[in-house]
Every structure is written in C-alpha cells, then in structure tokens.
C-alpha cells in the first residue's frame, strides 16, 4: 500500500548468515572479534588466535570474514576476523546476534595513545568508549553511552594481572577516520579542529584510540549482550614511535585467559541463581 514503510530484505540464506556463513551450531558462547590488521599480524588474525586454542576448526572463510571455533581450557570460543572500522564490525555482530546463541563479544585489537605514561606494547582494557564513529548513530542518539560489561572488563583485568602483562583500564576513543580523524596530517594538510585532536583527548585522559570498540559496546548494551575490548598500543604520539605487532601476543593471551575466568564466574552465577556477578562471590577467603 502507498505510504507503508518499506524495508530491504534481511541477509538470510535458508537459516545461514550471508556474510559470515555461520549457524548456531557453529558458534560458542564467547566470541572474539578482531580486525585484519597489518599493524598487528602478518597472517589472518582469526587463524593466529585459533593457534592459541587447544583445538580449533575453520567454520567459514568468506573473504570478508574468517571464523574459527575451538576450545581454550575446555571453554568453547569462536573467533571472527573482520574488516576495519565500525561498519564492518556492525555487519559481523548482527550476523552473530541473528545466527548464533553467543552472548559475549570481546574485541582483541590494536590502538594508539596520546598519553606519556602508556608505552607501546601495553594493553588498554576499555571501560567505555567515545563514539566518534558514525555507525552507532544509526541505532541510537549520540548521548547513549558506550560502556563495557563490568563482568567482561573485570575478567580481562584479572587475566592481564595474573599474566603480569602491563595494562591500563579507562576510556577508549573510537573514530571513523584513521588519518585526519586521529590528528594525522595528510600531505601536510589538516583542518584546525583536527590539529587539536591529540592535545584535546590527552587533556581529558582518553587512554587510547582505535575504530571498533564503541560500536561493540553500543550494540551489546542495546540488544542485551555483553561487550568488552582489549587493545594493544602499537603507536605513541608523545614518544613518536610505531611498532608493528607490539603487544599482540599479550592481547591474545589476555583475552583467552579472561574468557576462561569469565566462564568460571558464569558457572558460579548459574549455580547461585543470580543475574549479576558480585565481588563477594569471587572474593578469595583467607
């Protein structure tokens, strides 16, 4: 009828996702999302992370997304590599929302920093994210916060601490632009506002900057899932250095160990019949 809303068809191929080619039987409860990132890894990052698992099998390679499912200390985990930025991450997440029973999504990636006290190779566990990307605005107003699930964030911090890996917890800035939008001149050109980006975000204490965390946090909060992010710092503005691959091993070990810890906590919640993890439930008794 004239005037009725018209929507495009959903990406669905007889019960299987079109972009990632996954089904519910293929996917574990915990999903690691990572980017095909030349600043971190020479081979596909899903294959790299799968190599850290006890066992893993290739679910699908669609050129856009590569997906493996395996176990780590008995915990079923799926890892999916995506293209860079919020739009590509959105596509992957919506496919997992619709075609799996996963409820926990954790970014394992790379980032930069404007702060002197964070070194290249350190990890940043994002408690929240600045939404300086456009994709999340398609879902909800700009004042809606992008925040981590507290259980995921604590599990990642617990893992990094146990592994004795240098880490920081704080706010990440997610951008669309990897160049001018992060304060990098292009052929000696930079708008005045862009030139002030490093100093401004340094002043307000943003720990790091990248391109994906905010969309993960917004989508997870909006649709009732758990989101987290652990990013290695591979470039430092104040120190003027970039180190390809810095901290990648630390990120992968932290995220996998963090998921193992989170699975233990989830089991405690299930046994006690509570919805949210409380400190008293995991406190070590003397």
Predicted regions and their residues:
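Glycine-rich phosphate- or other oxyanion-binding loops that anchor nucleotides, phosphorylated ligands
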Residues: 60-286
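N-terminal short beta-loop-beta anion/metal-coordinating cradle
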Residues: 1-90
């Amino acid at each position: 009828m004239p005037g009725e809303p018209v929507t495009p068809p959903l990406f669905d191929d007889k019960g299987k996702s079109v972009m990632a080619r996954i089904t519910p039987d293929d996917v574990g409860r915990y999903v690691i999302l990572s980017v095909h990132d030349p600043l971190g890894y020479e081979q596909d990052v899903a294959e790299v992370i799968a190599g850290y698992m006890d066992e893993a099998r290739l679910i699908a390679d669609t050129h856009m997304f590569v997906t493996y499912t395996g176990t780590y200390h008995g915990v079923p985990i799926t890892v999916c590599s995506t293209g860079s930025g919020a739009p590509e991450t959105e596509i992957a997440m919506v496919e997992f929302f619709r075609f799996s029973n996963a409820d926990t999504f954790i970014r394992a990636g790379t980032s930069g920093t404007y702060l002197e006290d964070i070194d290249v190779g350190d990890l940043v566990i994002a408690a929240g994210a600045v939404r300086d990307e456009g994709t999340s605005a398609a879902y909800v107003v700009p004042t809606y916060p992008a925040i981590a699930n507290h259980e995921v964030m604590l599990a990642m911090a617990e893992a990094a601490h146990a592994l004795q890996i240098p880490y920081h917890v704080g706010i990440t800035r997610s951008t669309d632009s990897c160049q001018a939008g992060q304060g990098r001149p292009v052929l000696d050109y930079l708008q005045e506002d862009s030139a002030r980006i490093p100093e401004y975000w340094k002043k307000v204490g943003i720990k790091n900057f990248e391109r994906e965390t905010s969309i993960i946090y917004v989508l997870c909060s909006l649709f009732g899932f758990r989101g987290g992010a652990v990013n290695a710092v591979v470039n430092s503005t104040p120190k003027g250095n970039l180190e390809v691959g810095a901290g990648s091993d630390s990120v992968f070990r932290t995220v996998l160990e963090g998921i193992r810890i989170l699975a233990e906590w989830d089991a405690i919640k299930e046994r006690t019949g509570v919805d949210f993890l409380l400190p008293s439930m995991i406190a070590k008794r003397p």
